[in-house]
Amino acid sequence: MREEDHLRKGEKSHVFESLVSGAIAGLAARSAIAPLDTLKLRLQLGTDTLPHTLKSLIRHEGLLALWKGNLAGSIMYIIYGSVQFGTYSYTNAALLKVCDVPPTIHSTLAGAITGMASSLCSYPFDVLRTRLATTTTTTTTATTGRSGRGLYQHIERIYIREGLGGFFHGVATSMANVTVSTAAMFGTYEGIRARWPETNAGTAGAISGVISRTITFPLDTIRRRLQIRTSSELGQMTNNGYIGKHMQRSAITLCVQIVRDEGVKVLFRGIGLGLLKSVPNTAINLWVYENLMRVLT
């Protein structure tokens, strides 16, 4: 029996129900992958191996350090998830009035627009999450971002030292990354569901997550560097001395310099965890969203 698909071309879904379902789906996904996300970020921005990173984190910061920046990350995922699916539902219907293209292309276009909107709206919390999760000092709950107080302190610190622009370092690269990734995710997801109708949402979501993540991982690495390199606490976030030296504003120029000084492999540091994270993240996101939409509509 074919499952109902609320993301299919022309599917009429109410924006409010999509916002609510997307927010809950985003939070559910975040709760499942928070420790993997922390480890992935540290591998991406550091120079140590996974075993050494995990061992050092637990020994010097405690097991709960795997959830550093979790509050900022949870808020980010709620905003991102609600905007993502709300925008997709609206765009999905609106595109039908503008152009009539094959379902896969339709979903890819809607996904690209969705990616830009959701990335821009949630970006300040993405910056906060990255900085909090990669800070390696042994600190209290209040300063690791697992509480409202710690999150507020970091917001205040960034605003005072870097201004409003501090919350948007790397936003252009992020929008390019997320736009391509989201377009690939929705395009692949709908392509799989159209070609193999019996495929369930979780399986299609997992496959689309792996493909989209692999394509865009180098952009994600560049974005993470842009997010932390202007911080006054950079030395506590990474042991990679090149990050503080590579201060080019252009993502392309920065990419060239990274490859020249550190090699192509650096752009893919942490991709194993990134892919491992993307499978449950995308699968849970789409599965929870689809099932909540069935309940709410």
From Swiss-Prot:
GO cellular component: mitochondrial inner membrane
Alphabetized UniProt keyword annotations: Membrane, Mitochondrion, Mitochondrion inner membrane, Repeat, Transmembrane, Transmembrane helix, Transport
Function: Mitochondrial transporter that mediates uptake of thiamine pyrophosphate (ThPP) into mitochondria.
Protein name from the UniProt record: Mitochondrial thiamine pyrophosphate carrier 1
Similarity remark: Belongs to the mitochondrial carrier (TC 2.A.29) family.
GO molecular function: thiamine pyrophosphate transmembrane transporter activity
Pfam families to which the protein is assigned, alphabetical: Mito_carr
Residue intervals passing through the bilayer: 19-36, 75-91, 109-128, 163-187, 203-219, 270-287
Protein's membrane topology: Multi-pass membrane protein
Compartments where located: Mitochondrion inner membrane
Solcar repeat residue intervals: 13-94, 102-195, 196-295
Record GO biological process: mitochondrial thiamine pyrophosphate transmembrane transport
Highest taxon listed in the record's lineage: Eukaryota
